[in-house]
Design a protein with these regions (language model features):
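N-terminal assembly/interaction segments in proteins that build large macromolecular machines
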Residues: 1-201
Length: 201
């Protein structure tokens, strides 16, 4: 089972006194992602993450409600369900330095879905302008930016995109000086489209 790809699964978010637990657990099929045992396991991990604060090694060693560590319960769940299951990633955000906001896309129940976006904002006041946080979180889920700003986009991704753009222009038979101008315009558009602060709102 370990050689198979676990590309389905669930993302979970839980809030406790303004602190946020985010966790992603993968399985092989959408069918298993809807399985009660799988969902219950994920929910308990989401709670455990408040203690382990996003550290996967700590999560694996934590005892669950049945008294067994997460790693043993994971092995048992894999054996019972018959699919590869992996705890892909976990994050924890405390309630200091701003207010935490999140958005759950395609929620199957509260705090559980396929995609969860998260944003922490400073200068936002509860009850005043806090709806901006929820709107930004929703925008992130819809537009999937690669980074906060242009400089944050991985150089390898930019270089690869530039390579693709140049190959397309070269194949179209445009003169070099025109090709250079077009490639600059296209890479600028790519950077704007993929950085949150430059995306169209």
């Amino acid at each position: 089972k370990m050689s198979r790809t676990a590309s389905e699964g669930l993302a979970l978010v839980k809030e406790n006194k303004g602190n946020i637990s985010l966790i992603e657990v993968n399985c092989e099929t959408d069918f298993v992602a809807k399985n009660k045992d799988f969902i219950d396991f994920c929910k308990e991990l989401s709670e455990i993450n408040f203690t382990s604060k996003g550290d996967l090694n700590k999560i694996n060693e934590c005892k669950m409600s049945n008294g067994n560590p997460v790693k043993d319960n994971l092995v048992n769940l894999i054996s019972k369900i018959g699919e590869k299951i992996t705890i892909r990633r976990a994050n924890f955000y405390d309630n200091s330095k701003g207010i935490n906001f999140f958005y759950v896309h395609s929620a199957i129940e509260k705090g559980i879905g396929k995609i969860i976006s998260f944003v922490k904002l400073e200068g936002v006041l509860k009850g005043k302008n806090e709806d901006i946080g929820s709107k930004i979180a929703m925008h992130i889920a819809a537009s999937n930016p690669l980074a906060l700003d242009k400089d944050g986009i991985d150089k390898n991704i930019v270089d690869k995109e530039l390579e693709i753009i140049k190959a397309e222009i070269t194949n179209s038979g445009k003169p070099a000086e025109v090709a250079d101008k077009i490639s600059k315009g296209k890479i600028s558009k790519f950077l704007n489209d993929n950085s949150l602060l430059n995306q169209i709102w």
